[in-house]
UniProtKB/Swiss-Prot annotation:
The gene is nuoB. It comes from Bacteroides thetaiotaomicron (strain ATCC 29148 / DSM 2079 / JCM 5827 / CCUG 10774 / NCTC 10582 / VPI-5482 / E50). GO terms for cellular component: plasma membrane; respiratory chain complex I. NCBIfam families: nuoB_fam, PRK06411.1, PRK14816.1. The keyword Transmembrane does not apply. This is NADH-quinone oxidoreductase subunit B. The lineage of its organism: Bacteria, Pseudomonadati, Bacteroidota, Bacteroidia, Bacteroidales.
Length: 197
């Protein structure tokens, strides 16, 4: 029995991440869309390097941080994917992994850490608490999702998510980085935090 249809990869949350064929087609369109061929090839090279050497800054406040530590163990080797260089300083990090509940008092600190990161920077919301507030959603002092103050690039659901879910989310971020236009701007949107309005 032969399988004729390729498996589709679920998107998180962008529709252009349907499968590898559409991603390759999008990259070809970007390279042939009247842009400089040299810059297109240079974009591919730079984005390949950036996507395979993402340095995370972990902002862990609950059980998702414990699951993130399992990624560095021998069973789940982060070095295979280029995430092994976890940073303690936001000035040396490419992405921030928000793992856990964010309270209203903690939100300005998280925003300050995000602002200290160099561009291009990425945000990964890990676990139910960071994605939507989790079991503390109705509480008066909990932020209902990190996307209220930061532009989230990838959501990793779960309470806590398994290490495989971490890797799936990180690979989605790698795919997003690979199709960005490094020379001539990135496809970013900035958010104004609710507590600063």
């Amino acid at each position: 029995m032969e399988i004729t249809k390729k498996p589709k990869i679920k998107s998180i949350p962008y529709d252009e991440f349907i499968d590898n064929e559409s991603l390759e087609k999008l990259v070809k369109e970007l390279n042939t869309g009247g842009a400089n061929v040299f810059l297109g090839v240079l974009d591919d090279l730079v984005n390949w390097g950036r996507s395979n050497s993402l340095w995370p800054l972990t902002f862990a406040t609950s059980c998702c941080g414990i699951e993130f530590m399992a990624l560095g163990a021998a069973r789940y080797d982060m070095a295979r994917f280029g995430f092994e260089v976890a940073r303690a300083s936001p000035r040396q990090a490419d992405m921030i992994m928000v793992c856990g509940t964010i309270t209203n008092k903690m939100a300005p600190v998280l925003k300050r850490l995000y602002d200290q990161m160099p561009d291009p920077k990425y945000v990964v919301a890990v676990g139910g608490c960071a994605v939507s507030g989790g079991p503390f959603k109705k509480s008066y002092h909990v932020l209902n999702g990190v996307d209220k103050i930061l532009p989230v690039d990838v959501y990793i659901p779960g309470c806590p998510p398994r290490p495989e879910a971490f890797y799936y989310g990180m690979m989605q971020l790698q795919r997003k980085v690979k199709i960005e236009k490094f020379f001539g701007g990135t496809n970013r949107k900035e958010k104004k935090p609710e507590f600063m309005k």
